[in-house]
């Protein structure tokens, strides 16, 4: 049987394989926003203020960055921000070198960008030049600038003019920042000590020999941005001119920042032959060849040379970016970046034998960290399986990443294993490995399970994908798709072996967490299939009490297995109500989905504008009427409709679709149809998945309701009385329409109760569980994420361990429900697709239990759950397009 292939062609790949549509207006706060009151700390006389004046930055400012990245970037970009920028010392965040032309031509843009960074608690150090301004004044005096090896020859007259110009340009930038409410400090001396570079040749040009950090540290302690000139002094006080690029580099050697950024009007280095901007330069591989290029001369040659000498002294993770002013935030906060990124790169070693890598490292990467499908349970078994294969192995210098390619069939090499330590996913080592693979193999194929971590990264690196044999098959460079078809047909025994291995092996700590000790600390339980529990009586001991009598609930014994894919046919989706937070998150999920694609997005407010963050094709917002909707349905142009509309608005559209007698699916995210028996209730983990697969009308549950039902279902038969649910949501749950519930001026240092009785979710929870509950919602100052503290009166006594085991057994095999022993936290669950259940407190009487649930209201509470329901109704794997933690 021929296998239907879907060739997904991606365009516009940039630096790390993903293109993000970033609007500067999203990132550059306007003056009225930036000019907010800054945090002022109080300290006793003589007490030294901490180096970071915002030891606890305003939480909503951090949320702003995370929210922006969630909208325009990838999960890895959010992780990079959280990992680096929320922990990096303020003075080590970034050094930004500003060319003189930037201050003349783009002062407002520069000031807004710097003010934004400062507003979210970051303190970039600015070093600026003034070359064009200096040349202009010299030209008015009929003085021709002289250069040698890219260095300005500075005589006494030039030095005198330079001093005046530097002070004026420094004052301009400081004043522009102060007007935006951002405190800035001019530092025009006392930082750089220099000696004459070559007095006879260059005259008053210096070579920096010492950097005094104190003025910079004092500036940051005072809560001001340090703005430095590139002038230096000798030990005796003689003023010397120093190239601003060199000055920024010398400062970076001392401070060792995460990023060094050079702003220039061209927005990067331009290849003199192709006239195109260079996206990236890996110096370890490209430096020698680059310096021989005829177009690399004068200032360009000096710049590249100085950058190499700088990066040779910094950690390998450091980089230098040459970008335009408007792309500053994009470079700092997204992995796609902008302009030209220069780094040393990561040395990738090549081997022909698995024995070239130490067994301990290889076992960790292949058995525990491997993202690709592999049936081996031990390193020995893995090696035995491949002993007759021709292999090519790639690893980094520290053996923290490995890729293994089977080259036995040279016409279609297969990537068998790809394992990497967590930090290597964040610092782009994996990208260096893939770049090397693409250089060595014009075509390559690999396979992943739907639950694989970093699935979206592998998707972004491919040119085609197909779901078959319960795997995602990815490839690039394959021209003859019959090869793919034949490989997939022959791969079924391998797929069956994977499934058999997973269904029989006992759970291990490594299957749940990368750190064995964390499973003991958090008491998280790893999941396997239900057959394990029916065979293993020891693991089922928690279901029995004195005398072997079972009394725990039948709900705890239910196992609803996720459904496998029965289709790989692409589907066109229309999103009505795309302006809100849920709509934006759903757009992001569909953007990386292997089969779904948007055909229309409807928003009255945004009609006619381009849809950001969607790269499969260019789409503009439209404003669809009920007649438009009916016509599209009659034409059969749409496979699925998602209604992301406010409560009470959906019905006219549903009626229009129904009148057209179409066959498309409707997933409604509002509360309008949650109580309609003719609609399926879309909470797959607690309902009939087959019914959802066969339904054309699905009502998406509410966010509070999803978390509450997950928190109560395993113990329904033990409840004695009315449970009470104390719910707190981030302000994204209040929507985008301005109100006190999403006004940060009201929410800061505050918690607002609302709808104290008869909230729609109280009714929904009670209706679905057939158990009355009391629900009290609150809104807090964080952006997204919900915590639910559920108090449950019990009929019979129970211990905390027995309670936890009920939940573990009920949600065994559900990848989007995580059960843990300790209390789950909102910040750990935010931006994650799963629900976390934990705490499991039991009163000393044993008759009252408290369960804590966290859920991301925009993902599993809305967009992720909608995608689950779309996947089921369209016949796809339930978790297609969903990253499983």
Swiss-Prot record:
Low complexity bias spans: 503-523
Annotated pathway: Amino-acid biosynthesis; L-arginine biosynthesis; N(2)-acetyl-L-ornithine from L-glutamate: step 2/4; Amino-acid biosynthesis; L-arginine biosynthesis; N(2)-acetyl-L-ornithine from L-glutamate: step 3/4
Protein location: Mitochondrion
Coiled-coil residue windows: none
Domain N-acetyltransferase: 346-499
Activity: how regulated: The kinase activity is inhibited by arginine.
Region Disordered, residue ranges: 503-532
Transit peptide start-stop: 1-59
Its EC number(s): 1.2.1.38, 2.7.2.8
Annotated GO biological process: arginine biosynthetic process via ornithine; L-arginine biosynthetic process
Reaction it catalyzes: N-acetyl-L-glutamate 5-semialdehyde + phosphate + NADP(+) = N-acetyl-L-glutamyl 5-phosphate + NADPH + H(+); N-acetyl-L-glutamate + ATP = N-acetyl-L-glutamyl 5-phosphate + ADP
PTM section of the record: The protein precursor is probably cleaved into the two biologically active enzymes, the kinase and the reductase.
Keywords: Amino-acid biosynthesis, Arginine biosynthesis, ATP-binding, Cleavage on pair of basic residues, Kinase, Mitochondrion, Multifunctional enzyme, NADP, Nucleotide-binding, Oxidoreductase, Transferase, Transit peptide
Chief subcellular location: mitochondrion
Active-site residues per Swiss-Prot or TrEMBL entry: 703
GO CC annotations, alphabetized: mitochondrial matrix; mitochondrion
Highest taxon, organism lineage: Eukaryota
Molecular function via GO: acetylglutamate kinase activity; ATP binding; N-acetyl-gamma-glutamyl-phosphate reductase activity; NAD binding; NADP+ binding
Matches recorded under Pfam families: AA_kinase, NAT, Semialdhyde_dh, Semialdhyde_dhC_1
Similarity comment: family membership: In the N-terminal section; belongs to the acetylglutamate kinase family. In the C-terminal section; belongs to the NAGSA dehydrogenase family.
Protein name: Protein arg11, mitochondrial
Organism listed in the record: Schizosaccharomyces pombe (strain 972 / ATCC 24843) (Fission yeast)
Lineage: Eukaryota, Fungi, Dikarya, Ascomycota, Taphrinomycotina
Chain's gene name: arg11
